[in-house]
């Protein structure tokens, strides 16, 4: 699966992949130690949800990189994080949104014994000034006040279509409140019909439903391959709807705007905005942030 015969690649997570993949600690141990015994290298890609499986595999880890490291402070993930911070030779943490704690019993990235000291911290304005990311542009849409918790799918559809039309957006990330809201929007309103009449495709992905493109269920690899292909196509118009699964970790340069349909914490908002301020075509000069 790779061009280097002396490099062995394994995935440790429950997601779909064509690479060697398992969450079984015994198989992880055998795979890693076979490579080690042959004097060859092994790279393991895992998730925070599956990191404890590598702890259980009891293998030697020389270097570990924690991407989106603010997730590592979560109660379910921190024990494995702390373990590898102690036993690995080199341990690095990367995040645009560090999560600190002022509570003794609640882990935070300011815990020096686990996370060490900050090696590099680059302010976002510097990244904008040096041309690495685009500045965000915030647009606030005034909505009528709805009493109670009743979900109005038709109103959601109207608000989204108006926002897309008013701002002339071709490639949009929509952050919904829940999977239920997404399914209601797609099945109990004219949202899909309105998109199709304007020449848009649509995509959705949640942990409950999996990935869907224009009504067809697909695997995750197909979803992300399509997302990247459409993002690079200047003629393609689409919306991608999610609850939380796309808030971080994706790099699609073509996404022009994010529309929030729910309240999010600081990290969730920052990470979602980060999806649309990536460099794109020369015509893309900012990432649009639409807030109801």
Predicted features, each with a name:
Residues 179-206:
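Conserved helicase motor "Helicase C" RecA-like lobe of SF1/SF2 P-loop NTPases
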Residues 1, 12, 170-178, 205:
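Conserved RecA-like ASCE P-loop NTPase motor core of nucleic-acid helicases/translocases
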Residues 29-81, 242-244:
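Conserved RecA-like ASCE ATPase "motif II neighborhood" in helicase/translocase motors
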Residues 116-189:
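Conserved interdomain linker/interface between the two RecA-like ATPase lobes of SF2 helicase motors
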Residues 71-133:
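Post-DEXD/H (motif II) to motif III coupling segment of the RecA-like Helicase ATP-binding lobe
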Residues 1-26:
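Conserved helix-turn-beta segment of the N-terminal RecA-like "Helicase ATP-binding" lobe
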Residues 71, 207-292:
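Conserved RecA-like P-loop NTPase helicase motor core
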Residues 44-47, 89-96, 239-242:
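Structural recognition of the conserved hydrophobic beta-strand(s) that form the central parallel beta-sheet
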């Amino acid at each position: 699966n790779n061009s280097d015969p002396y490099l062995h690649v394994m995935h440790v997570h429950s997601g779909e992949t064509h690479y060697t993949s398992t969450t079984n600690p015994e198989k992880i141990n055998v795979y890693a130690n076979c490579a080690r015994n042959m004097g060859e290298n092994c790279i393991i890609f895992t998730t925070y949800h599956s990191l404890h499986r590598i702890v259980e595999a009891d293998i030697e880890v020389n270097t570990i990189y924690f991407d989106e490291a603010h997730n590592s402070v979560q109660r379910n993930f921190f024990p494995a994080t702390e373990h590898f911070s102690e036993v690995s030779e080199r341990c690095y943490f990367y995040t645009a949104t560090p999560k600190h704690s002022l509570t003794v019993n609640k882990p935070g990235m300011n815990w020096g014994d686990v996370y060490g000291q900050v090696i590099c911290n680059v302010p976002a304005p510097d990244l904008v000034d040096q041309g690495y990311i685009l500045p965000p542009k915030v647009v606030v849409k005034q909505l009528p006040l709805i009493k109670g918790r009743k979900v109005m799918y038709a109103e959601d559809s109207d608000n989204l279509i108006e926002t897309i039309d008013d701002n002339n957006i071709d490639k949009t990330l929509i952050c919904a409140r829940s999977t239920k809201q997404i399914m209601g929007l797609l099945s109990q309103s004219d949202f899909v019909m309105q998109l199709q009449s304007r020449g848009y495709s649509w995509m959705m992905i949640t942990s409950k439903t999996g990935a869907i493109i224009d009504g067809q269920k697909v695997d995750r690899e197909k979803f992300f391959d399509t997302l990247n292909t459409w993002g690079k196509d200047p003629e393609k118009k689409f919306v991608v709807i999610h609850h939380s699964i796309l808030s971080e970790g994706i790099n699609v340069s073509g996404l022009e705007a994010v529309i929030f349909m729910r309240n999010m914490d600081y990290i969730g908002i920052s990470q979602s905005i980060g999806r649309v301020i990536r460099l794109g075509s020369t015509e893309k000069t900012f990432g649009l942030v639409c807030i109801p």
